[in-house]
Amino acid sequence: MTEQDAQELHEYKVLIDRYIDAGDGQRIEIAAEIERRFSVETTILVLDISGFTRLTSKFGIVHYLSMIRRMQLLTTSIITDHQGEIIKFEADNLFAHFPDVDAAIGFSLDVLQRFRSMNVSTNDHSDIHASIGIASGSVLVLEHRDAWGSTMNLASKLGEDLAEKDEVLVHEDAFSASRKKSFYATERLELMASGISIPARKIRG
């Protein structure tokens, strides 16, 4: 953790502790201060490796951990080529943010293509397939290592729960900001999650 990250974390803890102890009126002001200090407008990407249950039950957890490590090495090596920054790796997921939706889509298509190339030289049970979700909006970011907010939740829902393997799902609001719409072959979908309709674009990698 850098000195700046440590200072930001300390300032956040001071504010959130004040929020806990404050009355309703003060809480509104403190919440606004936290959002002003730590919120950023960004594009969130969540990548999830497909096949956890099947692969671990058949080949064991160490085999699956080796696949996670290969995913981490690949994505780390190319994310800056697409102006992205890794927020964190968690289990078999990658959480990252990008300056705009086109950068996130570009990374998605690149990484899925690289997985396909890697899979040519591996056995089927070692092949890596991933599902990816993308959403844009305001998020709270701390230490450059974690993020919270509805945009983060939406990207996670798209990437972990709704996208199929080798598929990219981009929330419609994020896709509408793309400057390269005509370059992508997409299918518009109306998805449902927890009783909520989620308009999205499906992009095949």
What kind of region is each of these model predictions?
Residues 1-31, 165, 170-205:
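Intrinsically disordered, glycine/charged-rich C-terminal tails and inter-domain linkers
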